[in-house]
Amino acid sequence: MSQYHTFTAHDAVAYAQQFAGIDNPSELVSAQEVGDGNLNLVFKVFDRQGVSRAIVKQALPYVRCVGESWPLTLDRARLEAQTLVAHYQHSPQHTVKIHHFDPELAVMVMEDLSDHRIWRGELIANVYYPQAARQLGDYLAQVLFHTSDFYLHPHEKKAQVAQFINPAMCEITEDLFFNDPYQIHERNNYPAELEADVAALRDDAQLKLAVAALKHRFFAHAEALLHGDIHSGSIFVAEGSLKAIDAEFGYFGPIGFDIGTAIGNLLLNYCGLPGQLGIRDAAAAREQRLNDIHQLWTTFAERFQALAAEKTRDAALAYPGYASAFLKKVWADAVGFCGSELIRRSVGLSHVADIDTIQDDAMRHECLRHAITLGRALIVLAERIDSVDELLARVRQYS
């Protein structure tokens, strides 16, 4: 049995030689730690020609950006690996491939995606991937349908819910999405110039009631195996290709949470574009983001309904019209969770580069205010925003 220890670059090379499935493992000779996240070590492993051939990822027993004062379970590495394996089974073209996982070392070896780029960076740089939103919608439809009650036998579904219980990581989501932004908390992070805006969130009874309802749905609705953190920084893109990574927040939850998080990150980019590109040049890019959102949702909904028509196993759920009615509830959830993502990324612990890298302070603060204002509107008006076209109209209204 392996004993947990924090990997060095040398350890990563030795491990990849053993488990990366390379024809000539001795060709793997060096590694570089490239992780920029908060929870893990990530190594690129290179061959003698300097070509990256594999990724070695190890969970740390604490939140990296905070330190050992915020401990974390290492079991999240098992949950991430098993989530990605399950998602790969249903959407191999859009999920990173896991070659090997060791639960004792909390380490996995996965395919190298050096020919891809992190989508967030490409969005900020205004590099457009016209197929990405459709591919993301297809990924979400495939993995969420095939792990839902529409497809799984009830016994299998209940067993999987138990397998993917993820209380430690869900607690982080519960705090960062639904608690911290609406109270005074040391984890919150925002410029002093936004103090009045953030205080208004804390004093907004209508908003806090709506957030409570969202949190309750996050607690109680085990609809499908979520990615749990499907933002533009956990998606790799290339010409004609999209791959989801980083699923340590995977658990069975409300389908609208993944949809809303994905849409929310496109809207965060939308909010930040005037600061990144200038007001004049941002106009066309903003329209692309809104088109991305439309394509993401319509692709997801069409694929999910087609899968439901073809593959639903439960007689009651297969009744004509039920899948469509279910998706209306998913959409309402998605709009609310989208608003939560906008707010928590603006005032909470973990921000996004789409806005944080804006050099001009006044413009950055204005973009943050835009995200906060839009986020609040989406949360409190979610039940009235009954279509993707209505969502886009609301976004334009708050621009």
Curated annotation (Swiss-Prot):
GO terms for biological process: L-methionine salvage from methylthioadenosine. It catalyses: 5-(methylsulfanyl)-D-ribose + ATP = 5-(methylsulfanyl)-alpha-D-ribose 1-phosphate + ADP + H(+). The keyword Iron does not apply. Its EC number is 2.7.1.100. It comes from the Bacteria. Signal peptide: none annotated. ATP binds at N40, K57, E111, D112, L113, D246, A247, E248. Pathway: Amino-acid biosynthesis; L-methionine biosynthesis via salvage pathway; S-methyl-5-thio-alpha-D-ribose 1-phosphate from S-methyl-5'-thioadenosine (hydrolase route): step 2/2. GO terms for molecular function: ATP binding; S-methyl-5-thioribose kinase activity. Pfam families: APH (PF01636). Transmembrane segments: none annotated. Keywords: Amino-acid biosynthesis, ATP-binding, Kinase, Methionine biosynthesis, Nucleotide-binding, Transferase. Substrate binds at D229, R344. It is an enzyme of class 2 (transferase). Gene3D superfamilies: 3.90.1200.10, Phosphorylase Kinase, domain 1. Homodimer. Belongs to the methylthioribose kinase family. Catalyzes the phosphorylation of methylthioribose into methylthioribose-1-phosphate. This is Methylthioribose kinase. It comes from Klebsiella pneumoniae.
